[in-house]
């Protein structure tokens, strides 16, 4: 470790121990070095004994700064790793920090743009509209058309801080499999790698711009979701320029009610937006917390969501989508056998998993959920229960599903905050069943043919040549097989002859030895020489 890394590591240890987080170290033999090492820092003790463990963990991460705050936010979605009291506290972490100087923001934008700010913008406001750990936002107008825009600018010098802390996280992750019996299955280095990728993606605002453009295209003219326009000509890796929006924060229930918003429809549309993104588009906004969601002031009886901050997105492949949809439907039909089979078929748990045992475990954990009214059952907690059960059957962490679960919990919490009577299953079931029907049968075949038509139209003129090449390759392959067969037969014949010669040679050698012991020297010499010669010829035939 470098001196800088050692200083940072000591700071992390000091903060963790001052909040009593050594309580998280399990009392098992493998962690004995950690527990012994804890006594080396005898002067550091828990100064927050009046607070719960989850709250102390949250406060410690806040004290360590933005990189650890974001890590805690991501880990709050890993409810397969943490008990609810800790995960709930981590979910309260707020990514809000003081804004940096507006003059510095202006300078940073001008460096990125390659000229004076006034070349492209009027009315730049040096006072930040919003500020977070990675970036902050300022308002302005486009000089060419006077449209109101926001400029998102990355914090100067944030990259070295992120890289230094992530390097330390990798080192710490390397210790986890050695100290925890379940550490290897949790794939801690992969968790850190996923977190690093998320952070670095957020640092590249061109990626966020591309995500926003894709989402806007997916929901063009949609009555459910509006994504602000991105002015890509003005975007740089550290600067994002997009349309300024005006709306009611989705968490401001009083303002929405005063506006006369149809809260039931708004809540249902949140669910529909999520499932449309996941199953129709395979591309979903994965940071849909209330700070990134607004509701348009226009037509409150037919409410429209406005989504911002598209830095984090997720996607599922076709197989994952199918298994996920079938899992939900099988679960709500209480077909636990099918749920178990789907987990095995998808590869989420090992192929040699005992399906009967797995089914029984799922039934034991999930059946009590149905003691609640159907409208009160949480999709997110259904996934959580399934993943926690599958974990006992060596299910490896699926990062894409973790991101989906986090987003689903956001959507559920938001929907029930807007309309407590929201029946998520009634809203989602028709969508899931319709999507599954579209994946099979003649319509699915026709759609697949349409999708592949351009490819085959391009390849069709080359078809005769491809057929000829295939026939030639088949002919050459056949000749190679015949040649190889002859070689193998010859080799087998030589090996048979060699075995015969080895047998004859061994017999002659043994006979010669017996004759030699009987003082028949001349005869024994002939036998021994003949035996050695037979062995030599046999050896040569094997070469």
From Swiss-Prot:
Principal localisation: membrane
Residues where ATP binds: 129-137, 152
Protein name as annotated: Probable protein kinase UbiB
Organism in which the protein naturally occurs: Yersinia pestis
Pathway: Cofactor biosynthesis; ubiquinone biosynthesis [regulation]
Alphabetical UniProt keywords: ATP-binding, Cell inner membrane, Cell membrane, Kinase, Membrane, Nucleotide-binding, Transferase, Transmembrane, Transmembrane helix, Ubiquinone biosynthesis
SUPFAM superfamilies: Protein kinase-like (PK-like)
Superkingdom: Bacteria
